Structure formats: C-alpha cells, structure tokens
Amino acid sequence: MFDLKQTLLLISELMHLFLLRLQNTSVMDPQTADRSPKITLIKVSNGPLTGSRKRPSEGNYEKEKDVCIQLFDQWSEADQVEFVEHLISRMCHYQHGHINSYLKPMLQRDFITALPAQGLDHIAENILSFLDARSLCSAELVCKEWQRVISEGMLWKKLIERMVRTDPLWKGLSERHQWEKYLFKNRTTEVPPNSYYRSLYPKIIQDIETIEANWRCGRHNLQRIQCRSENSKGVYCLQYDDEKIISGLRDNSIKIWDKQTLECLKILTGHTGSVLCLQYDERVIVTGSSDSTVRVWDVNSGEVLNTLIHHNEAVLHLRFCNGLMVTCSKDRSIAVWDMASPTDISLRRVLVGHRAAVNVVDFDDKYIVSASGDRTIKVWSTSTCEFVRTLNGHKRGIACLQYRDRLVVSGSSDNTIRLWDIECGACLRVLEGHEELVRCIRFDNKRIVSGAYDGKIKVWDLQAALDPRAPASTLCLRTLVEHSGRVFRLQFDEFQIISSSHDDTILIWDFLNVSTNGQTEGRSPSRTYTYISR
C-alpha cells in the first residue's frame, strides 16, 4: 500500500509527464532532453495504466514540483479541476482511498463551532433553528459549543413559536395555558431561560397526545345550558369564540352567553319568526329568520343596524366574509349581497336553478356552493355568479354542507354524508351510520363532526375517509349521545364541540379539561355535568 507521500509523488510524476509534453512542443536544450527520465507503462490490477520510473533526486523532484505548481496556479479554477480529475481517473482504487482520507477532514468541518469564532453566532443559530425537536435534542449532545449556541440562541423558544404560528392546536394550547405571554418576545424583554422552554416542549407534546386520545376514546367533560325558552323550545343555530356563545332560538330570540360562566348576558329581540341561522364577527351579528328577513345587529350593543327584506319565505342559511354575503331561502333562491358597511348592504345578484328549498350555502373567493331539498349541490362562480356544475348523488334532500379548498362535505335526509371533489364533481366517499336525517356537519384538517335527527353526534376520521383503501368500519371514531332531541347545529375546534338541539339545550363537550371518571355503559364516557338554567 502506498502512503500519502507516495501518492503525492505519483501525482507529481504525472505532472512531470505533462511538462515533458509541453517541452516537446517547444525548442529544447539537447542536454536537458538527454536527462529526461525513461518512462515505462505498467498495468496495475483493477486500475488504469500508471507511470513507473526511478525516483529522481530530491533536488530535481522539488524543482519539477515547483514548476508544476506554478503552472497549476496560472490556470483557471475550471482547468484546475479538470486537470485534477484527469489525474485521479488514472489512479487505482487504493490510491483513491488515500486521497479520500486526505480530503475528508477538509470537507467535514464543524461549521457550527467555527461560525461563533468568527463573530457569526447569529448564522449558527439560524441554521440550527430549522431543526425539529428530535434533531435539536441530538444537536445538544454533539459538544458543549453546540449546546451553548442552542441555549443562548433560545432555540427551544423559537421552535415552540414556530409551532404556535403554524398549528391551531399549539396556538389554542398557548392561549388556554397562558404560556403565550412568554413567546414572541425579543431578547431585551424579560423572558425565562432556554431551560424553561426546553422543559415546556415535552409537556406540550404530552398535552397534545392526551387531547388526541380523548377524541379517539370519547373522554370529555360535559357542560349543559338549559335555555328555558318560554314558548317554542329549540336552539336552531349557534356560533362561539373564547368569550361568548351566540344562539338563535325557535322562540324568535337571540341569546348571548358568557363562555366561562355560562350565564346569559343579553337577549336580542326583533324577529317575528324563529331564528334559523346566524353568523357574527367582531362588529356585527347577522341573523336569518322564518319571518323572511335578514337582520344586522351591533355585536356589542345589540342594536339593530339594518333589516334586509328580499326573500319571500324563510331565510334558511347565510354566510358573509370580506364584504360579500350569501343568503338562501325556502323560496328556492340564493341572494348575493355586497356589504360595504353594516348599514350599506346592496343586492348584487339572485341565483336561481334549484327546484326546492335551498337549505345551506357556503363560499370562498372561487365558488359559491348551495345545497337543496331537490337532492343536488350546485356550484356557482363567486366572481361572475354564473352556474358552474351540479353534484349529484344523494338520494334525498340535502340539509347541511361545508366547503373548503377542493372539498365539499354534505349531509342528507338519506342519512348519509358524502365527500366531494368540487373541481371534478366526483363523490369521494359515502359515510353511513346515522339513523335519521343528517342536519349539521363541520370538518377541519383531521375530523368530520356530524349531528343528526337521531340525537347523536358522530366524529369521523377525515384523512381515512379520503383514503379509498380505508375500510368503512374504521371511519367513525366515536358516537356521542347526550341530546334527547334532534341535533340542529354544532361547531367544533381542537378542544371542544358545542352543539344545540330541539331539546332546548346547548352542550359543551370539552376534550381538554377531562375528569378521570370511568365510562358509563351505553352513554358517552367520562362525563362531568354542569347544568345552567336561564
């Protein structure tokens, strides 16, 4: 085996050959030519042809090497690389091994340690900030310098902040556990040390795993609001945030509840028929009623700001966003409105085409989607209000629908739920399990939650439902049974479901703050009741 010095000697000899060729093309001194070494070619096993000659004296070798280096330095980088590649291609595999051993430490440098030495700590921190939790744990064990960069760069804090920005579950936990006050602060403000965030991360992971297990197993804490309607009983619609729940009732009223205490804060009256649908934002509440009107209320004062009279029969559903509102009615029509302000709302277009009551609408910047008792879902262009396509498949009227991105999920009085690709109109999956009309449905990135006239709420695995290979028996994760009447409306997030029913109650199913009670046969497991009557 050649050692490294022998390999370098061989390279210099090949360079000498190259010089000889250069000299052969020019006028040469006869005496110099006579002293040229005699070269013979030998074949090395498993390698290319290599030159073999008697080693020149040290003096000649040094001179020849210096000449080669001078010529090499005069070439461009591309020519240098090409020349070295040519030399390497003429070597044997064991010579390649020697060169690899020589180059390896040059190529595998600890740049994380080297950067701070050059005053570039921020670059080292930025590089390591892209690591996930497992890789960050490993990086801490590399050496003390890496551990110092991670600690002083507060990289565990940055990792948690990145998760909070991109994952709704992390964001919700940060708000509920109040450790968001330690996030998104610069280094000049007083923040805990890196060790605080290092220990916080596994606690968050444990919380997330517990919440996911609670959803799968149906473990929840249950709170119940008894609405105590005076005349007609039933809660037709609701929406909630962290502070309040706003509900529309069969007795024509709108009730606003404190989310924490479950106390009724305010009752809005004005409709002369049942409040069938509602939506609110930070400024207004918009409601639709069986009295055929749409009313706009100030969300803080409860004052009526506007009343829209257009539909000839009950307003069954409405949605508004970014200055656009869409309403639908038992009169079979869909109305598209421009909302310049709460008091300046004008009718843009009326969409007709359904042959029965239009029960639900949803929209985004691309499509308006409507579903009807005529068993069809129709798709319209949001910008032009022109008809695009019809989705056919349900065997009876469609009662509920949600649309987001390319996915439409609908529920019908044929007791099924269907998933659709809105772009091609294909039905992707049929979910079966409810025993009566599916009245309300919502989905997020993980789950579909449905409520039906059978009084049951079902939680479905969305990703499995979108996988055609998944068996139908694996799709329904849990059935929740607490309502004693038809489920009219529900909304959910990562931590809870809030539902309303014909039984005049609003139920809050909390999957975050769960007691340790055991399961009860035939009912939803792990329930703790809070009864509020107002």
Curated annotation (Swiss-Prot):
GO terms for cellular component: cytoplasm; nucleus. Keywords: Cytoplasm, Nucleus, Repeat, Ubl conjugation pathway, WD repeat, Wnt signaling pathway. InterPro entries: Beta-TrCP_D, F-box-like_dom_sf, F-box_dom, G-protein_beta_WD-40_rep, WD-F-box_domain-protein, WD40/YVTN_repeat-like_dom_sf, WD40_repeat_CS, WD40_repeat_dom_sf. One of its GO terms (biological process) is sprouting angiogenesis. Residues 59-108 are annotated as: Homodimerization domain D. Disruption phenotype: Knockdown of both fbxw11a and fbxw11b results in abnormally developed pectoral fins and heart edema by day 3 post-fertilization (3 dpf). At 5 dpf, knocked-down embryos show periocular edema, small and misshapen eyes, and abnormal development of the jaw. WD repeats lie at residues 228-267, 268-307, 308-347, 351-390, 391-430, 431-463, 480-510. Substrate recognition component of a SCF (SKP1-CUL1-F-box protein) E3 ubiquitin-protein ligase complex which mediates the ubiquitination and subsequent proteasomal degradation of target proteins. Probably recognizes and binds to phosphorylated target proteins: the interaction with substrates requires the phosphorylation of the two serine residues in the substrates' destruction motif D-S-G-X(2,3,4)-S. SCF(FBXW11) mediates the ubiquitination of phosphorylated CTNNB1 and participates in Wnt signaling regulation. Self-associates. Component of the SCF(FBXW11) complex. This is F-box and WD repeat domain-containing 11-B. The gene is fbxw11b.
